[in-house]
Amino acid sequence: MGKNVVVLGTQWGDEGKGKVVDLLTERAKYVVRYQGGHNAGHTLVINGEKTVLHLIPSGILRENVVSIIANGVVLSPEALMKEMGELEARGIPVRERMLISEACPLILAYHVAMDVAREKARGAKAIGTTGRGIGPAYEDKVARRALRVGDLFNKDTFATKLKEVVDYYNFQLVHYYQADTVDYQMVLDDILAVAYVLTGMVVDVSELLDSARKRGDLMMFEGAQGTLLDIDHGTYPYVTSSNTTAGGVATGSGLGPRYVDYVLGIVKAYSTRVGAGPFPTELFDDTGEFLCVKGNEFGATTGRRRRTGWLDAVAVRRAVQINSLSGFCLTKLDVLDGLQEVKICTAYRLPDGRVVESTPLAAENWEGIEPIYESMPGWSESTFGVKAFDKLPEAARRYIKRIEEVTGVPVDIVSTGPDRSETMILRDPFDA
């Protein structure tokens, strides 16, 4: 019997999860998003055609796969309808392939207004959120005032609850942030206009997944963002508002934790980060510019330029520890082609001179950290599109082996280009 697989990022997001999920869904029956919202940006390239998904699971392009948005996701009806419209215009029957948990909190206009107002008020100390209302929506969930998909089944009760929440937000927007208010009637009209679409896809996700498990159907859980952006384990406060780590699968989907069999960590061959926050290996020189341009390091969601740097094995080891990683998928190896030298950060030197091999938690404790590098020869030959490990340049193979050695985790998949075909699977996660 095959295994249930989690795919998640080991760094600060943007590792290339979407492509890997799309590739592996060939064997999965269910693909589940279990955290985050439309702040994610998963780019798929299939036969040269590019698709960017923000909220809908990457399995949606597969005919025989059921895509699920589970309870751990905060759902923007506006973003969902836009994404569905784009896919349906291409002939993809989204409503036949996708299901939604009734427990998903909704992201509405007042969440976006609050997100934008807060970031503006922070000024130079801004977190660097996407401004899409993710954080405020998770706040409402924890404060037990969230409006959820299931609330749409009773429109009168929904309208009453919405009025209370809009009043609460408008008071803050006006009196604390000196920002414009949100129009209650407009918010209500907008959500009720699409309520039938959302309620038409509602299912008890936990029940569905448990039944699927008993039948032996294969499941894949698609993480968004990356481990180092986890609300608990990331570089706080420069983090996202959800649990991006493997522990979020059980709470965010309702599948029992014993039924997760294999955790695949996606690790980019170098490091990137969007927005503010610690980044010890960040490069400000020509190499950093080379990685940004060649790697096309611009956010799929925001279009923002990503910061770039050498691979940080210390940070990746933290991801190994937190997620109990079974194996790695190494992505964007081809971006390193042509560099005379490649480096891996294997330890940090603290301001007091001590050398440590683990990451701090709070962002302020990262200040003054100096990366300690191992240097390795680069390679001039192209790795782009290579589909056999022994066909890679020797120096590239040594680089991969060194990553395995310093992290203690095998590289089971290597990606050498954006297309799903430009991948070598050394060990299939479903059979590992």
Swiss-Prot record:
Cofactors that this protein relies on: Mg(2+)
Binding annotation for Mg(2+): D14, G41
Residues annotated as binding substrate: A300, T301, T302, G303, R304, R305, R306
Record-linked SUPFAM superfamilies: P-loop containing nucleoside triphosphate hydrolases (SSF52540)
Chain residues that bind GTP: 13-19, 41-43, 306, 332-334, 415-417
Pfam families in the record: Adenylsucc_synt
Catalytic activity: IMP + L-aspartate + GTP = N(6)-(1,2-dicarboxyethyl)-AMP + GDP + phosphate + 2 H(+)
Biological role: Plays an important role in the de novo pathway of purine nucleotide biosynthesis. Catalyzes the first committed step in the biosynthesis of AMP from IMP.
Name used for this protein in its record: Adenylosuccinate synthetase
Origin species: Sodalis glossinidius (strain morsitans)
